[in-house]
Design a protein with these regions (language model features):
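Metal-dependent nucleotidyl/phosphoryl-transfer cores and adjacent nucleic-acid-binding surfaces
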Residues: 212, 229-248, 254, 263, ...
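Generic beta-sheet signal
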Residues: 31, 55, 219-221
Length: 295
C-alpha cells in the first residue's frame, strides 16, 4: 500500500503526537529489546508485550527458513565445499590459492557476503567485473558457482507473499513475544517499524513486502537542535522517497520528572551541544572537565 515516515522529538510524549491513535493499535516492531522495554515502561497498557516486540522476530517469522539454523549450516557447508573444490582461474594461480585459503579461514565473512548478495537479489550479469578487487572477484565466482548448481536451492529466499502470508508471519512474531496475545484484536492494516538506523538488505526486503499490502510506518527520533548528529538519519530515511512528517511536539529536554534517566539525558544533551560546536552551552557538573584535543 504505502510507506509513511514519522518523527518524534520527545520519547516521553509519543502519546501527544498526531499519529498516536494510529500506532497504538497495530503491530509494532522495534530495532531492539531495549526500545521495547522502554516503551512498555512509559506507556504501559498501550504498549503491551506481544503487540510490541523486536523487528528481528518479524524477520525470523517472515523468512523462517532463511533465518533457521538448518539453512545457515547448509549454506556454510556449500560455500566451504565450493572454495575447497576450486574455482575457475579468474586470478593468478598463487593469488587465487592464497585468497581461497584466507576465505576458508575467515569463512563467516564470506558467508555473510554471499547471503547479502542473495538478499539483494543481485543480477550477476549487471556486475562490472573489471571494477572489482581480487577478493571481490573471488566472491563473485563463488556466487556464480552457487547459481549454476543445485546448491542454489539451499539459498532460496521466499519472495511471493500473499496478504494472508504476511498476516500469519506477523501473528507468529507477536505470539513468539507473548503466547497468550489475541492476534485477532490487533489492527494489522498498518505496521510500525521503530528506530531502525541501519537498514540491512533483509530488513529492506521485509519492509518492501509489507508495504505491498499494508501501510508501513517508519518511526524515528529526530532532535532538530542536534542537526550534526541527526542529519544522517534524515539522509537515510530520505532514500525511501516518501515525505518525512516532522513532529509538532516540543523538542526534548532533560527533566527531573524522569529521575532514573535524568543524568544520562543531561550527558546526551551535552554531547549533542559539543557536536554542534556549542561549547558555551554545555552544562557542567563539578566532576566533569572538557578537554579540547588539537591535532
Amino acid at each position: 500500500m504505502s510507506i509513511a515516515i514519522y518523527t518524534y522529538r520527545d520519547p516521553y510524549k509519543l502519546n501527544k503526537e498526531a499519529y498516536w491513535d494510529e500506532i497504538k493499535e497495530c503491530p509494532y516492531f522495534c530495532v531492539s529489546q531495549t526500545l521495547v522495554n522502554g516503551l512498555k515502561t512509559i506507556y504501559k497498557k498501550d504498549f503491551q508485550q506481544g503487540r510490541v516486540t523486536t523487528i528481528q522476530y518479524l524477520i525470523e517469522s517472515l523468512y523462517e527458513y532463511w533465518e533457521s539454523t538448518a539453512c545457515i549450516v547448509k549454506q556454510h557447508t556449500d560455500i566451504d565445499n565450493i572454495i575447497s573444490a576450486g574455482l575457475p582461474p579468474v586470478l593468478g594461480s598463487d593469488m587465487q590459492e592464497n585468497i581461497a585459503r584466507a576465505f576458508l579461514y575467515n569463512r563467516e565473512e564470506v558467508f555473510e557476503s554471499i547471503r547479502v548478495m542473495f538478499e539483494l537479489n543481485i543480477n550477476i550479469n549487471e556486475i562490472i567485473f573489471d571494477k572489482l578487487t581480487p577478493e571481490q572477484k573471488f566472491i563473485v565466482e563463488v556466487f556464480k558457482k552457487i547459481l549454476s548448481s543445485e546448491k542454489k536451492n539451499d539459498f532460496f529466499l521466499k519472495d511471493d507473499f500473499s496478504g494472508d502470508d504476511i498476516d500469519t508471519a506477523i501473528d507468529r512474531a507477536m505470539l513468539r513475544a507473548r503466547k497468550d496475545i489475541e492476534c485477532a484484536s490487533v489492527n494489522k492494516d498498518c505496521v510500525v517499524i521503530h528506530g531502525v538506523h541501519q537498514f540491512s538488505p533483509i530488513v529492506l526486503r521485509a519492509i518492501e513486502k509489507l508495504a505491498e499490502s499494508k501501510k508501513v510506518i517508519l518511526l524515528f527520533n529526530y532532535q532538530p537542535q542536534y542537526k550534526n548528529i541527526y542529519q544522517t538519519w534524515i539522509d537515510i530515511y530520505s532514500a525511501f522517497d516518501s515525505p518525512i512528517s516532522d513532529s509538532n511536539v516540543a523538542e526534548f529536554r532533560p527533566s527531573l520528572s524522569f529521575p532514573i534517566s535524568y543524568e544520562g539525558n543531561v550527558l546526551a544533551d551535552n554531547i549533542g551541544k559539543l557536536t554542534n560546536g556549542q561549547m558555551t552551552d554545555v552544562s557542567l557538573a563539578s566532576d566533569i572537565e572538557i578537554l579540547e584535543l588539537i591535532i
